[in-house]
């Protein structure tokens, strides 16, 4: 079973009391809740905090999406990767984080007509393949 927090609800610390729960990290939810993923090192710090709070190996799924709204807005309005307020560089940090090893990523962005999510998937693949200096 996966647990996904929503903006403005800080209950991920409960996961450590339930060993059968995993965590779904939603980038737009984290942004909406006030985690500054866009600043250099921001995604890394947020994922470090998630691992420290929930425990290693608990991250089981990522919902990847940029945000149309300002940091801390508590609004969950998805944007295409690299075109919103989070920005492409944060997703490069996401893929460089060791907690992401083997974790599936689901694209949750606005569909772009007949091509669907192809552009966002290609962008994420490029970012995942590009080395990022961390920490």
Annotate each predicted stretch with a short phrase.
Residues 3-81:
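Acidic/histidine-rich catalytic cores of soluble enzymes
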Residues 5, 43, 87-88, 117:
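A structural signal for well-ordered alpha-helical scaffolds and beta->alpha junctions
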Residues 18-19, 57, 101-103, 131:
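Secondary-structure boundary/capping positions in well-ordered alpha/beta enzyme cores
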Residues 44-53, 85-99:
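A short, acidic, amphipathic alpha-helical segment used as a generic capping/interface helix at domain edges
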Residues 84-86, 121-122:
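Active-site loop/helix belt of alpha/beta enzymes
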Residues 95-104, 125-130:
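S-adenosyl-L-methionine
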Residues 106-115:
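A short, acidic, flexible beta-alpha connecting loop/helix-capping segment that sits on the rim
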Residues 114-133:
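C-terminal helical cap(s) of enzyme catalytic domains, especially alpha/beta-barrels
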